[in-house]
Amino acid sequence: MDLQRTLMFSCWVLSLLIIKTTAYNEKQLFQPLETENANAMTAVMERGLKTQRRPEHKNAYATMMYMGTPRDYEFYVATRVLIRSLKSLHVDADIVVIASLDVPINWIHALEEEDGAKVVRVENLENPYKKQTNFDNRFKLSLNKLYAWSLSDYDRVVMLDVDNLFLKNTDELFQCGQFCAVFINPCIFHTGLFVLQPSMEVFRDMLHELEVKRDNPDGADQGFLVSYFSDLLNQPLFRPPPDNRTALKGHFRLPLGYQMDASYYYLKLRWNVPCGPNSVITFPGAVWLKPWYWWSWPVLPLGLSWHHQRRYTISYSAEMPWVLTQAVFYLGIILVTRLARPNMTKLCYRRSDKNLSMIQTAFKFVALLFILSAYIIPFFIIPQTIHPLIGWSLYLTGSFALSTIPINAFLLPILPVITPWLGIFGTLLVMAFPSYPDGVVRALSVFGYAFCCAPFLWVSFVKITSHLQIMIDKEVLFPRLGESGVTSGLSKLY
Protein backbone atom coordinates (compact mmCIF):
# COMPACT_ATOMS: atom_id res chain seq x y z
CA MET A 1 0.00 0.00 0.00
CA ASP A 2 2.86 2.39 0.78
CA LEU A 3 4.41 1.60 -2.58
CA GLN A 4 1.15 2.33 -4.37
CA ARG A 5 0.71 5.59 -2.47
CA THR A 6 4.24 6.56 -3.47
CA LEU A 7 3.62 5.71 -7.13
CA MET A 8 0.41 7.73 -7.31
CA PHE A 9 1.97 10.71 -5.56
CA SER A 10 5.00 10.54 -7.84
CA CYS A 11 2.81 10.80 -10.94
CA TRP A 12 1.38 14.12 -9.78
CA VAL A 13 4.74 15.45 -8.65
CA LEU A 14 6.20 14.66 -12.07
CA SER A 15 3.31 16.51 -13.73
CA LEU A 16 4.09 19.60 -11.68
CA LEU A 17 7.80 19.26 -12.49
CA ILE A 18 6.96 19.20 -16.20
CA ILE A 19 5.13 22.51 -15.81
CA LYS A 20 8.09 24.01 -13.95
CA THR A 21 10.53 22.70 -16.56
CA THR A 22 8.44 24.14 -19.39
CA ALA A 23 8.41 27.55 -17.75
CA TYR A 24 12.15 27.39 -17.15
CA ASN A 25 12.92 26.36 -20.72
CA GLU A 26 10.81 29.19 -22.12
CA LYS A 27 12.46 31.64 -19.79
CA GLN A 28 15.86 30.54 -21.03
CA LEU A 29 14.83 31.51 -24.55
CA PHE A 30 14.39 35.11 -23.55
CA GLN A 31 17.80 36.02 -22.18
CA PRO A 32 18.24 39.60 -23.44
CA LEU A 33 21.31 41.08 -24.99
CA GLU A 34 23.28 43.83 -23.37
CA THR A 35 22.07 47.29 -24.30
CA GLU A 36 23.90 48.64 -27.32
CA ASN A 37 25.30 52.12 -27.90
CA ALA A 38 22.89 54.86 -26.82
CA ASN A 39 23.91 56.89 -29.87
CA ALA A 40 22.23 54.42 -32.23
CA MET A 41 19.09 56.56 -32.48
CA THR A 42 21.14 59.60 -33.43
CA ALA A 43 22.76 57.62 -36.25
CA VAL A 44 19.35 56.54 -37.53
CA MET A 45 18.13 60.13 -37.54
CA GLU A 46 21.16 61.23 -39.55
CA ARG A 47 21.70 58.42 -42.04
CA GLY A 48 18.59 56.29 -41.91
CA LEU A 49 18.29 52.66 -40.83
CA LYS A 50 20.99 50.55 -42.47
CA THR A 51 21.17 46.78 -42.70
CA GLN A 52 24.47 45.19 -41.71
CA ARG A 53 24.39 43.17 -44.91
CA ARG A 54 24.44 44.97 -48.21
CA PRO A 55 20.98 45.28 -49.85
CA GLU A 56 20.49 42.88 -52.75
CA HIS A 57 17.28 44.38 -54.10
CA LYS A 58 15.84 47.86 -54.43
CA ASN A 59 12.66 46.93 -52.53
CA ALA A 60 11.96 45.05 -49.32
CA TYR A 61 9.34 43.23 -47.31
CA ALA A 62 9.76 44.19 -43.66
CA THR A 63 8.38 43.11 -40.31
CA MET A 64 9.31 43.93 -36.73
CA MET A 65 10.15 42.05 -33.56
CA TYR A 66 10.37 43.27 -30.00
CA MET A 67 10.41 41.71 -26.56
CA GLY A 68 8.37 42.18 -23.41
CA THR A 69 5.15 40.29 -24.12
CA PRO A 70 4.10 36.90 -22.68
CA ARG A 71 4.14 35.51 -26.23
CA ASP A 72 7.57 36.57 -27.52
CA TYR A 73 8.59 33.06 -28.60
CA GLU A 74 5.36 32.45 -30.50
CA PHE A 75 5.81 35.69 -32.45
CA TYR A 76 9.42 34.72 -33.16
CA VAL A 77 8.22 31.44 -34.69
CA ALA A 78 5.58 33.32 -36.69
CA THR A 79 8.25 35.71 -37.97
CA ARG A 80 10.38 32.83 -39.22
CA VAL A 81 7.42 31.22 -40.99
CA LEU A 82 6.54 34.55 -42.64
CA ILE A 83 10.12 34.97 -43.89
CA ARG A 84 10.36 31.42 -45.21
CA SER A 85 6.95 31.61 -46.91
CA LEU A 86 7.99 34.81 -48.72
CA LYS A 87 11.22 33.11 -49.77
CA SER A 88 9.26 30.15 -51.12
CA LEU A 89 7.25 32.54 -53.33
CA HIS A 90 10.52 33.79 -54.88
CA VAL A 91 9.84 37.43 -54.13
CA ASP A 92 12.09 39.93 -55.90
CA ALA A 93 12.92 41.84 -52.72
CA ASP A 94 14.98 41.73 -49.56
CA ILE A 95 13.30 40.61 -46.34
CA VAL A 96 14.09 42.89 -43.41
CA VAL A 97 13.38 42.36 -39.71
CA ILE A 98 13.35 45.50 -37.55
CA ALA A 99 14.43 44.00 -34.20
CA SER A 100 14.73 45.75 -30.86
CA LEU A 101 18.08 45.57 -29.09
CA ASP A 102 16.86 43.06 -26.50
CA VAL A 103 15.93 40.34 -29.01
CA PRO A 104 18.10 37.28 -28.10
CA ILE A 105 21.24 36.89 -30.18
CA ASN A 106 20.45 33.26 -31.05
CA TRP A 107 17.16 34.43 -32.57
CA ILE A 108 19.00 37.07 -34.59
CA HIS A 109 21.43 34.47 -35.91
CA ALA A 110 18.57 32.13 -36.87
CA LEU A 111 16.79 34.90 -38.76
CA GLU A 112 19.95 35.87 -40.63
CA GLU A 113 21.81 32.60 -41.15
CA GLU A 114 18.96 30.09 -41.45
CA ASP A 115 16.14 32.22 -42.85
CA GLY A 116 18.10 34.66 -44.98
CA ALA A 117 16.61 37.85 -43.53
CA LYS A 118 18.44 41.12 -43.05
CA VAL A 119 18.11 42.22 -39.42
CA VAL A 120 18.43 45.83 -38.30
CA ARG A 121 18.72 46.58 -34.58
CA VAL A 122 16.82 49.54 -33.13
CA GLU A 123 16.06 51.14 -29.80
CA ASN A 124 12.42 50.89 -28.77
CA LEU A 125 10.46 54.03 -29.50
CA GLU A 126 8.90 55.53 -26.39
CA ASN A 127 5.13 55.27 -26.53
CA PRO A 128 3.61 58.56 -25.28
CA TYR A 129 0.10 57.06 -25.26
CA LYS A 130 0.73 54.26 -22.75
CA LYS A 131 -1.16 56.09 -19.99
CA GLN A 132 -4.36 56.41 -22.01
CA THR A 133 -7.34 54.80 -20.31
CA ASN A 134 -8.07 52.48 -23.24
CA PHE A 135 -4.44 51.50 -23.87
CA ASP A 136 -3.65 47.81 -24.37
CA ASN A 137 -0.18 47.17 -22.93
CA ARG A 138 0.66 44.51 -25.54
CA PHE A 139 0.91 47.36 -28.09
CA LYS A 140 3.35 49.32 -25.97
CA LEU A 141 6.20 48.90 -28.47
CA SER A 142 4.19 48.62 -31.68
CA LEU A 143 5.26 52.14 -32.68
CA ASN A 144 8.61 50.57 -33.64
CA LYS A 145 6.82 50.01 -36.94
CA LEU A 146 7.55 53.65 -37.77
CA TYR A 147 11.20 52.70 -38.29
CA ALA A 148 10.13 51.35 -41.69
CA TRP A 149 10.23 54.93 -43.01
CA SER A 150 13.93 55.09 -42.13
CA LEU A 151 14.90 52.11 -44.33
CA SER A 152 16.56 54.50 -46.73
CA ASP A 153 18.37 51.78 -48.69
CA TYR A 154 15.10 50.84 -50.41
CA ASP A 155 12.74 52.49 -52.91
CA ARG A 156 9.60 50.82 -51.55
CA VAL A 157 8.88 48.75 -48.44
CA VAL A 158 5.90 46.49 -47.77
CA MET A 159 5.50 46.53 -43.98
CA LEU A 160 3.93 43.40 -42.52
CA ASP A 161 2.58 41.99 -39.30
CA VAL A 162 3.68 38.41 -38.69
CA ASP A 163 0.10 37.09 -38.73
CA ASN A 164 -0.11 37.41 -42.52
CA LEU A 165 -0.51 34.25 -44.58
CA PHE A 166 0.70 34.75 -48.16
CA LEU A 167 -1.08 32.77 -50.87
CA LYS A 168 0.84 34.19 -53.83
CA ASN A 169 3.62 36.57 -54.82
CA THR A 170 2.65 40.23 -54.28
CA ASP A 171 5.65 42.03 -55.78
CA GLU A 172 3.29 44.30 -57.73
CA LEU A 173 2.78 46.18 -54.47
CA PHE A 174 6.18 47.80 -54.97
CA GLN A 175 4.61 49.77 -57.81
CA CYS A 176 2.25 51.50 -55.40
CA GLY A 177 2.75 55.08 -54.21
CA GLN A 178 4.20 56.75 -51.13
CA PHE A 179 1.60 55.11 -48.87
CA CYS A 180 -0.97 52.40 -49.60
CA ALA A 181 -3.12 50.31 -47.24
CA VAL A 182 -6.25 48.14 -47.15
CA PHE A 183 -9.56 49.17 -45.60
CA ILE A 184 -10.75 46.05 -43.79
CA ASN A 185 -13.04 48.31 -41.80
CA PRO A 186 -15.08 50.50 -44.19
CA CYS A 187 -13.69 53.65 -42.58
CA ILE A 188 -10.35 52.62 -41.04
CA PHE A 189 -7.44 51.06 -42.90
CA HIS A 190 -5.54 48.13 -41.40
CA THR A 191 -1.82 48.40 -40.61
CA GLY A 192 -1.12 44.67 -40.86
CA LEU A 193 0.11 45.31 -44.40
CA PHE A 194 0.91 48.62 -46.03
CA VAL A 195 3.24 49.97 -48.69
CA LEU A 196 5.47 52.97 -48.06
CA GLN A 197 8.25 54.93 -49.64
CA PRO A 198 11.07 55.34 -47.10
CA SER A 199 11.69 58.98 -46.27
CA MET A 200 13.79 60.43 -43.49
CA GLU A 201 11.73 63.60 -43.71
CA VAL A 202 8.52 61.68 -43.02
CA PHE A 203 10.22 59.64 -40.29
CA ARG A 204 11.42 62.76 -38.45
CA ASP A 205 7.99 64.31 -38.79
CA MET A 206 6.40 61.19 -37.30
CA LEU A 207 8.77 61.34 -34.33
CA HIS A 208 7.81 64.98 -33.87
CA GLU A 209 4.12 64.01 -33.93
CA LEU A 210 4.84 61.46 -31.21
CA GLU A 211 6.47 64.15 -29.09
CA VAL A 212 3.44 66.43 -29.37
CA LYS A 213 1.14 63.43 -28.80
CA ARG A 214 -0.81 63.52 -32.02
CA ASP A 215 -4.35 62.20 -31.65
CA ASN A 216 -4.23 58.40 -31.40
CA PRO A 217 -7.47 56.54 -30.54
CA ASP A 218 -5.88 53.24 -29.49
CA GLY A 219 -2.36 54.33 -28.52
CA ALA A 220 -0.81 51.84 -30.96
CA ASP A 221 0.58 51.96 -34.50
CA GLN A 222 -2.91 51.46 -35.94
CA GLY A 223 -4.38 54.58 -34.38
CA PHE A 224 -1.31 56.71 -35.06
CA LEU A 225 -1.05 55.86 -38.76
CA VAL A 226 -4.79 56.23 -39.32
CA SER A 227 -4.52 59.70 -37.79
CA TYR A 228 -1.36 60.56 -39.76
CA PHE A 229 -2.78 59.45 -43.13
CA SER A 230 -6.31 60.60 -42.42
CA ASP A 231 -7.11 61.33 -46.09
CA LEU A 232 -6.44 57.81 -47.40
CA LEU A 233 -10.15 56.94 -47.62
CA ASN A 234 -10.56 59.57 -50.34
CA GLN A 235 -7.69 58.26 -52.46
CA PRO A 236 -8.04 56.11 -55.61
CA LEU A 237 -7.85 52.32 -55.65
CA PHE A 238 -4.48 50.88 -56.59
CA ARG A 239 -4.25 49.17 -59.97
CA PRO A 240 -0.80 47.84 -60.92
CA PRO A 241 0.48 49.61 -64.05
CA PRO A 242 1.21 47.33 -67.02
CA ASP A 243 4.88 48.26 -66.94
CA ASN A 244 6.24 46.50 -63.85
CA ARG A 245 9.15 48.95 -63.69
CA THR A 246 6.86 51.92 -63.07
CA ALA A 247 6.22 53.12 -59.51
CA LEU A 248 3.16 55.27 -58.96
CA LYS A 249 3.15 58.55 -57.07
CA GLY A 250 0.73 59.51 -54.31
CA HIS A 251 -1.44 57.60 -51.84
CA PHE A 252 -3.70 54.68 -52.77
CA ARG A 253 -6.21 52.32 -51.25
CA LEU A 254 -5.27 48.68 -51.73
CA PRO A 255 -7.90 46.10 -52.82
CA LEU A 256 -9.25 43.89 -50.03
CA GLY A 257 -7.55 40.84 -51.56
CA TYR A 258 -4.25 42.04 -50.09
CA GLN A 259 -5.61 41.81 -46.51
CA MET A 260 -8.40 39.25 -46.45
CA ASP A 261 -9.68 39.18 -42.89
CA ALA A 262 -9.94 35.55 -41.78
CA SER A 263 -13.35 36.30 -40.26
CA TYR A 264 -14.76 36.72 -43.79
CA TYR A 265 -13.79 33.14 -44.50
CA TYR A 266 -15.42 31.81 -41.35
CA LEU A 267 -18.79 33.20 -42.44
CA LYS A 268 -18.90 31.44 -45.82
CA LEU A 269 -16.10 28.85 -45.34
CA ARG A 270 -14.70 29.98 -48.68
CA TRP A 271 -13.20 33.09 -50.21
CA ASN A 272 -15.28 35.37 -52.38
CA VAL A 273 -13.32 38.62 -52.69
CA PRO A 274 -13.86 39.82 -56.29
CA CYS A 275 -11.87 43.08 -56.13
CA GLY A 276 -8.18 42.41 -56.63
CA PRO A 277 -6.18 39.20 -56.29
CA ASN A 278 -6.79 36.98 -53.29
CA SER A 279 -3.18 37.20 -52.14
CA VAL A 280 -2.86 37.60 -48.36
CA ILE A 281 -4.89 36.39 -45.37
CA THR A 282 -4.62 38.27 -42.10
CA PHE A 283 -5.68 37.17 -38.61
CA PRO A 284 -6.49 40.37 -36.66
CA GLY A 285 -8.67 38.70 -34.03
CA ALA A 286 -8.00 37.61 -30.46
CA VAL A 287 -4.35 36.99 -29.62
CA TRP A 288 -5.03 33.53 -28.19
CA LEU A 289 -6.59 32.44 -31.50
CA LYS A 290 -3.67 33.38 -33.72
CA PRO A 291 -3.10 30.60 -36.27
CA TRP A 292 0.22 29.39 -34.83
CA TYR A 293 -1.36 28.11 -31.59
CA TRP A 294 -2.17 24.41 -31.73
CA TRP A 295 -5.63 24.88 -30.22
CA SER A 296 -6.66 27.44 -32.88
CA TRP A 297 -7.67 24.54 -35.14
CA PRO A 298 -10.34 23.28 -35.60
CA VAL A 299 -11.87 26.22 -33.71
CA LEU A 300 -10.75 28.39 -36.64
CA PRO A 301 -10.31 26.26 -39.80
CA LEU A 302 -7.63 28.46 -41.41
CA GLY A 303 -5.15 27.66 -38.64
CA LEU A 304 -4.28 24.46 -40.48
CA SER A 305 -3.27 26.49 -43.56
CA TRP A 306 -0.71 28.42 -41.50
CA HIS A 307 0.69 25.21 -40.04
CA HIS A 308 0.89 23.76 -43.54
CA GLN A 309 3.28 26.59 -44.39
CA ARG A 310 5.25 26.05 -41.22
CA ARG A 311 5.59 22.32 -41.89
CA TYR A 312 7.23 23.05 -45.22
CA THR A 313 9.40 25.92 -43.97
CA ILE A 314 10.94 25.68 -40.48
CA SER A 315 9.22 22.40 -39.44
CA TYR A 316 8.65 21.37 -35.79
CA SER A 317 12.04 19.93 -34.88
CA ALA A 318 12.48 22.34 -31.94
CA GLU A 319 9.31 21.13 -30.21
CA MET A 320 9.35 17.41 -31.04
CA PRO A 321 11.76 16.24 -28.27
CA TRP A 322 9.48 17.78 -25.65
CA VAL A 323 6.42 16.28 -27.33
CA LEU A 324 7.96 12.80 -27.29
CA THR A 325 8.98 13.22 -23.64
CA GLN A 326 5.42 14.05 -22.67
CA ALA A 327 4.01 11.16 -24.70
CA VAL A 328 6.31 8.66 -22.96
CA PHE A 329 5.46 10.19 -19.58
CA TYR A 330 1.71 9.82 -20.19
CA LEU A 331 2.07 6.22 -21.32
CA GLY A 332 4.08 5.58 -18.16
CA ILE A 333 1.26 7.01 -16.03
CA ILE A 334 -1.26 4.70 -17.67
CA LEU A 335 0.98 1.70 -16.99
CA VAL A 336 1.70 2.67 -13.36
CA THR A 337 -1.94 3.31 -12.50
CA ARG A 338 -2.93 0.05 -14.14
CA LEU A 339 -0.45 -1.88 -12.00
CA ALA A 340 -1.54 -0.05 -8.86
CA ARG A 341 -5.25 -0.78 -9.39
CA PRO A 342 -5.79 -3.84 -7.11
CA ASN A 343 -5.24 -2.15 -3.72
CA MET A 344 -5.52 1.58 -3.11
CA THR A 345 -4.90 3.97 -0.22
CA LYS A 346 -7.32 3.83 2.71
CA LEU A 347 -7.78 6.51 5.34
CA CYS A 348 -8.71 5.85 8.96
CA TYR A 349 -10.85 7.76 11.43
CA ARG A 350 -12.61 7.28 14.75
CA ARG A 351 -16.41 7.08 14.87
CA SER A 352 -16.44 9.87 17.43
CA ASP A 353 -14.40 12.23 15.26
CA LYS A 354 -16.40 15.47 15.15
CA ASN A 355 -14.67 16.50 11.93
CA LEU A 356 -15.77 13.41 10.00
CA SER A 357 -18.26 15.32 7.84
CA MET A 358 -15.65 17.93 6.98
CA ILE A 359 -13.10 15.24 6.10
CA GLN A 360 -15.55 13.47 3.81
CA THR A 361 -16.48 16.74 2.08
CA ALA A 362 -12.82 17.57 1.61
CA PHE A 363 -12.24 14.09 0.24
CA LYS A 364 -14.91 14.58 -2.43
CA PHE A 365 -13.47 17.98 -3.28
CA VAL A 366 -9.99 16.52 -3.71
CA ALA A 367 -11.31 13.76 -5.96
CA LEU A 368 -13.11 16.28 -8.19
CA LEU A 369 -10.03 18.52 -8.20
CA PHE A 370 -7.91 15.61 -9.43
CA ILE A 371 -10.36 15.00 -12.27
CA LEU A 372 -10.44 18.68 -13.22
CA SER A 373 -6.64 18.89 -13.12
CA ALA A 374 -6.40 15.93 -15.47
CA TYR A 375 -8.09 18.02 -18.17
CA ILE A 376 -6.25 21.28 -17.42
CA ILE A 377 -2.60 20.30 -16.87
CA PRO A 378 -1.95 18.75 -20.33
CA PHE A 379 -3.30 21.84 -22.07
CA PHE A 380 -0.72 24.15 -20.51
CA ILE A 381 2.39 22.01 -20.95
CA ILE A 382 2.02 21.19 -24.64
CA PRO A 383 4.36 23.33 -26.80
CA GLN A 384 2.09 26.13 -27.91
CA THR A 385 3.22 26.33 -31.53
CA ILE A 386 3.15 22.61 -32.31
CA HIS A 387 1.01 21.33 -35.19
CA PRO A 388 -2.70 21.13 -34.16
CA LEU A 389 -3.01 17.44 -35.00
CA ILE A 390 -0.03 16.66 -32.78
CA GLY A 391 -1.21 19.08 -30.10
CA TRP A 392 -4.72 17.67 -29.83
CA SER A 393 -3.45 14.08 -29.95
CA LEU A 394 -1.05 14.83 -27.11
CA TYR A 395 -3.77 16.62 -25.14
CA LEU A 396 -6.20 13.71 -25.47
CA THR A 397 -3.48 11.24 -24.49
CA GLY A 398 -2.42 13.36 -21.52
CA SER A 399 -5.91 14.04 -20.21
CA PHE A 400 -6.81 10.35 -20.47
CA ALA A 401 -3.58 9.32 -18.73
CA LEU A 402 -4.04 11.77 -15.86
CA SER A 403 -7.71 10.76 -15.57
CA THR A 404 -6.60 7.23 -14.73
CA ILE A 405 -5.03 8.56 -11.52
CA PRO A 406 -8.32 9.61 -9.82
CA ILE A 407 -10.07 6.60 -11.37
CA ASN A 408 -7.68 4.25 -9.60
CA ALA A 409 -6.88 6.32 -6.53
CA PHE A 410 -10.54 6.87 -5.62
CA LEU A 411 -11.94 3.68 -7.20
CA LEU A 412 -14.19 5.67 -9.51
CA PRO A 413 -16.18 4.23 -12.45
CA ILE A 414 -14.34 4.87 -15.69
CA LEU A 415 -17.14 6.14 -17.95
CA PRO A 416 -18.29 9.14 -15.85
CA VAL A 417 -14.68 10.31 -15.41
CA ILE A 418 -13.85 10.17 -19.12
CA THR A 419 -17.19 11.60 -20.28
CA PRO A 420 -15.60 15.08 -20.68
CA TRP A 421 -12.84 13.40 -22.70
CA LEU A 422 -15.39 11.85 -25.02
CA GLY A 423 -17.20 15.19 -25.25
CA ILE A 424 -14.01 17.03 -26.23
CA PHE A 425 -13.16 14.40 -28.83
CA GLY A 426 -16.65 14.65 -30.29
CA THR A 427 -16.44 18.45 -30.38
CA LEU A 428 -13.22 18.24 -32.39
CA LEU A 429 -14.88 15.92 -34.89
CA VAL A 430 -17.91 18.21 -35.23
CA MET A 431 -15.75 21.31 -35.76
CA ALA A 432 -13.37 19.56 -38.17
CA PHE A 433 -16.14 18.16 -40.39
CA PRO A 434 -15.19 19.43 -43.87
CA SER A 435 -18.55 19.60 -45.65
CA TYR A 436 -20.49 22.40 -43.95
CA PRO A 437 -22.15 24.70 -46.52
CA ASP A 438 -21.23 27.82 -44.55
CA GLY A 439 -20.01 29.09 -41.19
CA VAL A 440 -23.50 29.61 -39.77
CA VAL A 441 -24.41 25.94 -40.17
CA ARG A 442 -21.06 24.99 -38.66
CA ALA A 443 -21.60 27.22 -35.63
CA LEU A 444 -25.14 25.89 -35.12
CA SER A 445 -23.84 22.32 -35.32
CA VAL A 446 -21.23 23.00 -32.66
CA PHE A 447 -23.76 24.68 -30.36
CA GLY A 448 -26.24 21.86 -30.94
CA TYR A 449 -23.63 19.27 -30.06
CA ALA A 450 -22.66 21.19 -26.91
CA PHE A 451 -26.33 21.43 -25.91
CA CYS A 452 -26.74 17.66 -26.29
CA CYS A 453 -23.56 16.97 -24.32
CA ALA A 454 -24.49 19.12 -21.32
CA PRO A 455 -26.92 16.58 -19.74
CA PHE A 456 -24.33 13.80 -20.04
CA LEU A 457 -21.75 15.93 -18.24
CA TRP A 458 -24.21 16.67 -15.44
CA VAL A 459 -25.16 12.99 -15.07
CA SER A 460 -21.47 12.08 -14.93
CA PHE A 461 -20.86 14.64 -12.20
CA VAL A 462 -23.79 13.28 -10.16
CA LYS A 463 -22.60 9.69 -10.61
CA ILE A 464 -19.08 10.54 -9.46
CA THR A 465 -20.22 12.37 -6.32
CA SER A 466 -22.81 9.73 -5.42
CA HIS A 467 -20.27 6.96 -6.03
CA LEU A 468 -17.83 8.65 -3.65
CA GLN A 469 -20.56 8.99 -1.02
CA ILE A 470 -21.53 5.32 -1.33
CA MET A 471 -17.93 4.24 -0.92
CA ILE A 472 -17.58 6.44 2.17
CA ASP A 473 -20.83 5.10 3.65
CA LYS A 474 -19.76 1.52 3.01
CA GLU A 475 -16.40 2.32 4.65
CA VAL A 476 -14.48 1.20 1.58
CA LEU A 477 -12.36 4.34 1.50
CA PHE A 478 -12.69 5.22 5.22
CA PRO A 479 -12.50 2.04 7.36
CA ARG A 480 -12.85 2.59 11.10
CA LEU A 481 -9.66 2.67 13.12
CA GLY A 482 -8.77 -0.78 14.34
CA GLU A 483 -10.77 -2.56 11.66
CA SER A 484 -9.53 -3.94 8.40
CA GLY A 485 -11.09 -2.36 5.35
CA VAL A 486 -12.60 -4.26 2.51
CA THR A 487 -9.67 -5.99 0.89
CA SER A 488 -11.40 -7.90 -1.87
CA GLY A 489 -13.85 -6.90 -4.54
CA LEU A 490 -13.27 -3.21 -4.04
CA SER A 491 -15.13 -2.35 -7.18
CA LYS A 492 -18.19 -4.45 -6.23
CA LEU A 493 -20.13 -1.91 -4.24
CA TYR A 494 -23.60 -3.17 -4.92
UniProtKB/Swiss-Prot annotation:
Membrane-traversing stretches: 4-24, 316-336, 362-382, 389-409, 410-430, 444-464
EC code: 2.4.1.-
Main location: membrane
A GO CC term attached to the entry: membrane
InterPro entries the UniProt entry points to: GNT1/Glycosyltrans_8, Nucleotide-diphossugar_trans
Example GO molecular function: metal ion binding
Required cofactor names: Mn(2+)
Keyword Repressor included in the entry's annotation: no
SUPFAM superfamilies reported for this sequence: Nucleotide-diphospho-sugar transferases
Keywords for the protein's UniProt record, in alphabetical order: Glycosyltransferase, Manganese, Membrane, Metal-binding, Transferase, Transmembrane, Transmembrane helix
Annotated positions for site Important for catalytic activity: K145
Localization: Membrane
Membrane-protein topology: Multi-pass membrane protein
Positions of Mn(2+) binding: D161, D163
Family: Belongs to the glycosyltransferase 8 family. Glycogenin subfamily.
Protein name: Putative glucuronosyltransferase PGSIP7
Gene coding for it: PGSIP7
